[in-house]
Each structure stands twice: as structure tokens, then as C-alpha cells.
Curated annotation (Swiss-Prot):
It is found in: Mitochondrion inner membrane. The chain crosses the membrane at residues 33-53, 77-98, 113-133, 178-198, 226-246, 288-308, 320-340, 347-367. GO terms for molecular function: metal ion binding; ubiquinol-cytochrome-c reductase activity. Belongs to the cytochrome b family. One of its GO terms (biological process) is mitochondrial electron transport, ubiquinol to cytochrome c. Keywords: Electron transport, Heme, Iron, Membrane, Metal-binding, Mitochondrion, Mitochondrion inner membrane, Respiratory chain, Transmembrane, Transmembrane helix, Transport, Ubiquinone. Pfam families: Cytochrom_B_C, Cytochrome_B. The lineage of its organism: Eukaryota, Metazoa, Chordata, Craniata, Vertebrata. A ubiquinone binds at H201. Binds 2 heme b groups non-covalently. Heme b b566 binds at H97, H196. Heme b b562 binds at H83, H182. This is Cytochrome b.
Length: 379
């Protein structure tokens, strides 16, 4: 009799994806983040579902419903902070996952890479709308500032913003629709992640050497299931530490003040994981220019495969590119820091220089380093 694992129409799909999947034997811990992202997504959907049972998306009661969750619901504070800090963990894993893809040349799988970019946009949209829901000061003003950026679009901008708001300012209609979108988007992300995985399994995983590993594969289970469990334990440890010891470490104190349209906070800023893009937006004195730079800071990932000039796939044996990669990481950390600072000297100048460096490294220096490395190897 055939093993049910290999014959059952549904179970065999799981088997081909997570059990008998042929995997390169040399993939490092950097390949853990894909499964960690899947776990983060499931965690967010579950905690979000329980939060939605107690939350009300009305401007009059949203803030108090979140307070009620934290004070009166059994373990409501755990669920709320798991959800809020789970988003931070999600983005940490996302940035590591994208960084790994850039370092080891995983962008050479164009379908998988492009679905990944769509996933990034969907997750960013979900996180932004989720930040609006507690209806604190930073929720309200963050929503006002970020949606207002669309007014920079010529001719239709103002109408578009008012259409998104459902009125002439961020109001009850805005909060209700943001809640609806925040609820539905994770399921769209789930579908996209499945397609992402489907395309990946068409080609098989990349590996640190960047060379094909068709001649040498191992089954995913038990080798990588065990390896992924270690990553999961570390993720749970980090998240639990954050939730139980300093749940508000990554949040903004202004969000504990109920939303007030008549009082603007001194420094409006998004959550930490958007600060790098926010710094790029602010570094350009023109509104439309800033919005374009903001979009390009993420969309630039789509042209990374076109800028690959090296004859080697990954950066494992390319020291010049390695230096540039880590320079890019340092630059992104600088931008993240600048995004949280007030708009004054010297932060404006540092932000502008860091923004120029960001685009220069990706668009000019990395392709040039690939050509230089080919020349040095006489290829």
C-alpha cells in the first residue's frame, strides 16, 4: 500500500513542500527566516483575530476598546502586546530575509523575488493601517500625514485623498475602512506567500555558494525542520522577552493619548520599521519628489536583478561587493535613526547624505563593483 503521505491529494502537497522537499545540504541559518515569517504571519492572524473580537472601529470607542482589552479581557494585554511586538519581529525577519536575498543573489529567481516585493508592500500596508486602529495621537496624525502624501499626485491627488478618507479629514469612515482592510490583507498575504513558495519550489532553493546543488540534495525533514525549530525558539524567546519585560519599548508614548484633531504632536513619526523610508521622504524638500523617492526606496528592489553585473551569483566570494553590502546596512540603520529625529540641523543634512548614499550604493556602486571583480578574476 502506498504511503498516505505520498498518495493523499492534500497531504502530498504538504509532503512535497515541507517533508520530502529536496534541499541544498549547505544552506545556513540565513535561510531560516522564510519559515519564521510564516510563523510570524500565523501568530499575527491568530492574535489579531482575538483582538478583533473585542475591538470596536468607531472613533468614539476605539481607544477605550483597546484599553478595555488590556485591562478587562483575560490575558488581553498579552494578546495586544504579542500582536504589536509581533509586527516588529515580522519586520526584523523580513529585513533579514530580503538582505539574505540580496547578499546571496536569490533575486536571480525573478518570479519568487517579484512576488516577495508584492508581499513586502502588502505587509507594509497592513502594518500602517494596524497602527491607525488604537486611535491614539500618533495613529491619527500618522494616518493624516501618510495618506496626505497622495495629494502630491498631479490633478487627481486631492480628490484621491478625500476618497480614501471618506470625508474632508481622517474620520470615522477612515477608521472603519482601515479596520476592514487590516483584517482582510493578512489573508491576501497568506495567498501571496503560498504563491511565493510555489515559485520557489519550481526552481529549488539557492545556497550560500551560489552554485547549483542539483547533484547533492537532502530531504527537508528531519534536517531543516529541526534547524527551523531552533530559529523558532530564538524568535519566541526574543518576542516573549519584549512582551513581558518592555512591551512599549518600540512604541510611541504619544499613542497613549487619545486622538485629538486640534492638537498636533511635536514630532510625527511612524513605527520604527518605516523610519528609513520616512527619512528618505523627508530628505527631499519637494512634496512630489519626496513621495517618488519614498516609493522608489522600496521599488528599487525590483530592478536589483537587472543591475547584477557579476559572473558569480552571490557575494560569498566577492569582497568589494561585501563591503558595499554592509555599507548599505549601516546606511539603512543611519536612515532609521534620522527618521526618528526632529527636522533640524544637522539631521536634515545627514538624512540627505544617507539618502544619496542609499540610491548610489544600489544603482551605481554595486554594479560597478561586479564589473571590477570580474576584471580582477580575468573573467
Amino acid at each position: 500500500m502506498t504511503n498516505i503521505r505520498k498518495s493523499h491529494p492534500l497531504i502530498k502537497i504538504v509532503n512535497k513542500s515541507f517533508i520530502d522537499l529536496p534541499t541544498p545540504p549547505n544552506i545556513s541559518a540565513w535561510w531560516n527566516f522564510g519559515s519564521l515569517l510564516g510563523i510570524c504571519l500565523i501568530l499575527q492572524v491568530l492574535t489579531g483575530l482575538f483582538l478583533a473580537m473585542h475591538y470596536t472601529s468607531d472613533t468614539m470607542t476605539a481607544f477605550s476598546s483597546v484599553t478595555h482589552i488590556c485591562r478587562d479581557v483575560n490575558y488581553g494585554w498579552v494578546i495586544r502586546y504579542m500582536h504589536a511586538n509581533g509586527a516588529s519581529m515580522f519586520f526584523i525577519c523580513l529585513f533579514m530575509h530580503i538582505g539574505r536575498g540580496m547578499y546571496y543573489g536569490s533575486y536571480a529567481f525573478p518570479e519568487t523575488w517579484n512576488i516577495g516585493i508584492l508581499l513586502l508592500f502588502a505587509v507594509m500596508a497592513t502594518a500602517f493601517m494596524g497602527y491607525v486602529l488604537p486611535w491614539g495621537q500618533m495613529s491619527f496624525w500618522g494616518a493624516t500625514v501618510i495618506t496626505n502624501l497622495l495629494s502630491a499626485i498631479p490633478y487627481i491627488g486631492t480628490s484621491l485623498v478625500e476618497w480614501i478618507w471618506g470625508g474632508f479629514s481622517v474620520n470615522k469612515a477612515t477608521l472603519t475602512r482601515f479596520f476592514a482592510f487590516h483584517f482582510i490583507l493578512p489573508f491576501i498575504i497568506l495567498a501571496l506567500a503560498t504563491i511565493h513558495l510555489l515559485f520557489l519550489h519550481e526552481t529549488g532553493s539557492n545556497n550560500p555558494s551560489g552554485m547549483t546543488s542539483d547533484a547533492d540534495k537532502v530531504p527537508f525533514h528531519p534536517y531543516y525542520t529541526i534547524k527551523d525549530i531552533l530559529g523558532l525558539l530564538l524568535l519566541v524567546l526574543a518576542l516573549s522577552t519584549l512582551v513581558l519585560f518592555s512591551p512599549d519599548l518600540l512604541g510611541d508614548p504619544d499613542n497613549y493619548t487619545p486622538a485629538n484633531p486640534l492638537n498636533t504632536p511635536p514630532h510625527i513619526k511612524p513605527e520604527w520599521y518605516f523610519l528609513f523610508a520616512y527619512a528618505i521622504l523627508r530628505s527631499i524638500p519637494n512634496k512630489l519628489g519626496g513621495v517618488l523617492a519614498l516609493i522608489m526606496s522600496i521599488l528599487i528592489l525590483a530592478i536589483v536583478p537587472l543591475l547584477h553585473t557579476s559572473k558569480q551569483r552571490g557575494m560569498a566570494f566577492r569582497p568589494i561587493s561585501q563591503c558595499l553590502f554592509w555599507l548599505l546596512v549601516a546606511d539603512l540603520l543611519t536612515l532609521t535613526w534620522i527618521g526618528g529625529q526632529p527636522v533640524e540641523y544637522p539631521f536634515i543634512t545627514i538624512g540627505q547624505l544617507a539618502s544619496i548614499a542609499y540610491f548610489s550604493i544600489i544603482l551605481i556602486l554595486m554594479p560597478v563593483s561586479g564589473i571590477i571583480e570580474n576584471y580582477l578574476l580575468k573573467w
